[in-house]
Amino acid sequence: MTREERIRAAIAGRETDRVPVAAWMHLSEHDQDPISLAEAEVELTEKYDFDYIKMMPFGLYSTQDFGNQVKIYCDPYKEPIVQKFAIDGPAGYDSIRAISALQGTYGKQVEFARELAKRRIEGTP
């Protein structure tokens, strides 16, 4: 069975040649560069023959563009931490403005998704 066939069969409750498997972790040493992260995730998937790729972007990407000050280590053993929150009380919510999904930290995740789609082995969901 291919990876995709295995997953589709498992979801449908049909027999598979083996249990579909995947594992994921934050790849902090790569997650500030969309291309490096896409390459590392594909490499991890192929090394362990995982059946699908679970995207693991920078964990605080959804907050940084709104003003959170984040300490980034790029170290697999240190996760990023928020040093200062953008909102420190109820009135702070009035300062939230819409941002472009194609720029900033969020935009890097969109680029990561595009790069991952280009680099993944065909048939790997």
Predicted regions mapped to residue ranges:
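Catalytic cores of TIM-barrel enzymes
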Residues: 1-125
